[in-house]
């Protein structure tokens, strides 16, 4: 599994692994329960390699955020999203100290940590963007 094959679909919980292209969109597999479904071409689908986080300087790719989280947690999952916004912001602030606190909302941090935990739980250890 590579990060370029992991997708977020608007309106659907969790992350999905790209399996194949279908006549009407994509066949994806949920990382939460392993079920496959058809994601229509009209769905808002984003590859995780296309997402970035606001910082005080240049925006950084989500792959770099995940790499820093992985190094900080030494390969373990991050804090549970049930621990509350204060704990998640503290964790995120340690991992990405220069994130833009005005443009990165609590929900963004919660989603990033949740996605990171899903990927680590699924066995992903490298969060690299493939060079083209």
Region roles according to the model:
Residues 1-80:
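The feature represents the first ordered module of a protein
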Residues 71-76, 83-86, 94-98:
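Eukaryotic low-complexity, mixed-charge intrinsically disordered interaction/regulatory segments enriched
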Residues 56-59, 78-85, 102-109:
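Conserved phosphate/pyrophosphate-binding and hydrolysis machinery centered on Walker-type P-loop NTPases
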Residues 87-132:
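C-terminal charged interaction modules
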Residues 35, 43-45, 68-70, 83, ...:
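General N-terminal targeting signals
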């Amino acid at each position: 599994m590579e990060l370029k094959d992991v997708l977020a679909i608007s309106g659907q919980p969790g992350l999905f692994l790209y399996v194949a292209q279908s006549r009407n969109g994509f066949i994806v597999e949920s990382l939460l329960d392993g079920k496959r479904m058809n994601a229509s071409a009209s769905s808002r689908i984003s590859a995780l390699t296309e997402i970035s986080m606001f910082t005080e300087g240049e925006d950084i790719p989500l792959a770099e955020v995940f790499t820093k989280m992985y190094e900080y947690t030494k390969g373990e999952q991050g804090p549970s999203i049930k621990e509350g916004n204060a704990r998640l912001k503290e964790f995120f602030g340690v991992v990405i100290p220069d994130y833009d606190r005005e443009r990165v909302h609590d929900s963004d941090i919660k989603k990033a940590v949740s996605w990171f935990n899903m990927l680590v739980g699924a066995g992903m250890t490298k969060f690299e963007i493939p060079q083209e």
